[in-house]
Amino acid sequence: MAAKIRRDDEVIVLTGKDKGKRGKVKNVLSSGKVIVEGINLVKKHQKAVPALNQPGGIVEKEAAIQVSNVAIFNAATGKADRVGFRFEDGKKVRFFKSNSETIK
């Protein structure tokens, strides 16, 4: 099945503590989750590794968020949008449902 949300897409969070925030998708996981830049930040306690010269401490990093809790952001309308598929010149492409504009 083709993915509606892909890496480097700009998405907007629909639910949760980061509702309304926008970010770029860094990674799409096979478990139905995505990692979005600057969204769902968690604090991870990291142990020092002297052999690698790696300091310990508390590190903030992005945690995965369910793909159903994000929607692709349509810059033309300034809102979240739904994604559809169609064939153009024999290739399957994604498009915004609201204005039928092809997604990069």
Curated annotation (Swiss-Prot):
Keywords, alphabetical: Ribonucleoprotein, Ribosomal protein, RNA-binding, rRNA-binding
UniProt GO molecular function: rRNA binding; structural constituent of ribosome
Domain of life: Bacteria
Any Gene Ontology CC annotation: ribosome
A Pfam family hit: ribosomal_L24
BP term (GO), one: translation
Gene3D superfamilies: 2.30.30.30
PROSITE patterns the record matches: RIBOSOMAL_L24
PANTHER family named among the record's database cross-references: MITOCHONDRIAL RIBOSOMAL PROTEIN L24
Family: Belongs to the universal ribosomal protein uL24 family.
NCBIfam families: rplX_bact
HAMAP family, sorted: Ribosomal_uL24_B
Subunit and partners: Part of the 50S ribosomal subunit.
Job description of the protein: One of two assembly initiator proteins, it binds directly to the 5'-end of the 23S rRNA, where it nucleates assembly of the 50S subunit. One of the proteins that surrounds the polypeptide exit tunnel on the outside of the subunit.
Name by which UniProt lists this protein: Large ribosomal subunit protein uL24
